[in-house]
From Swiss-Prot:
NCBIfam families: nuoB_fam, PRK06411.1. It holds the Pfam family Oxidored_q6. Keywords: 4Fe-4S, Iron, Iron-sulfur, Membrane, Metal-binding, NAD, NADP, Plastoquinone, Quinone, Thylakoid, Translocase, Transport. This is NAD(P)H-quinone oxidoreductase subunit K. It comes from Nostoc punctiforme (strain ATCC 29133 / PCC 73102). Residues 236-245 have a biased composition (Basic and acidic residues). GO terms for cellular component: plasma membrane-derived thylakoid membrane; respiratory chain complex I. It catalyses: a plastoquinone + NADH + (n+1) H(+)(in) = a plastoquinol + NAD(+) + n H(+)(out); a plastoquinone + NADPH + (n+1) H(+)(in) = a plastoquinol + NADP(+) + n H(+)(out).
Amino acid sequence: MVLNSNLTTQDKQRIINPIERTNVTQDLSENVILTTVDDLYDWARLSSLWPLLFGTACCFIEFAALIGSRFDFDRFGLIPRSSPRQADLIITAGTITMKMAPQLVRLYEQMPEPKYVIAMGACTITGGMFSVDSPTAVRGVDKLIPVDVYLPGCPPRPEAIIDAIIKLRKKISNESIQERDKIKQTHRYYSTTHNLKPVEEILTGKYLQSDTRSAPPKELAEAIGMPIPPALLTEKAQKEEQTRG
């Protein structure tokens, strides 16, 4: 590098080191935003939640009211999707049965990461009124898929659904990309276990072929003077009938 001899020492220093640390003034500090990739990523996802609506019972009626203009849930950026591959939030509303459980797990597995779950209603969380004597109701959807937000109620109001979405947004804003795969569900709702005893099949397929269906009852047959079928006679009555004959 060849420098002009007519330049002063200060000018030479500026040419050699053109980049210097600038003084941060009050005006400059108000125009600079410092953030991280995690914060930017979480901020972008806060207003772009696309829910997959999984309604199986009466709780879904309240969610249908939320879609209306009175509550306007579009202000949160929620766009209902019909395909799990386009959704990052699934809202389970209603009773989950044993037959429906594999389909729910399959829909959850088809959703891309990161994905979230809101359990809406008492029947989804603990089985509700079906958790006592129903052999087909699942005692809590968290036995099938991890739940991020529990929304109790029978059914919960649309205002409660909005509150659950706000709580989920707060959870998303505090997440990290590196720690997302390491987070696992630790706390679950208490739910009762099955206390039912297995019994033999009641419906054998031969109900119409039974003796009581092919012939009238014994009292009715005696009243109208019809011969009593042998199937309705006891051993003692059969012996008496034989001795008479």
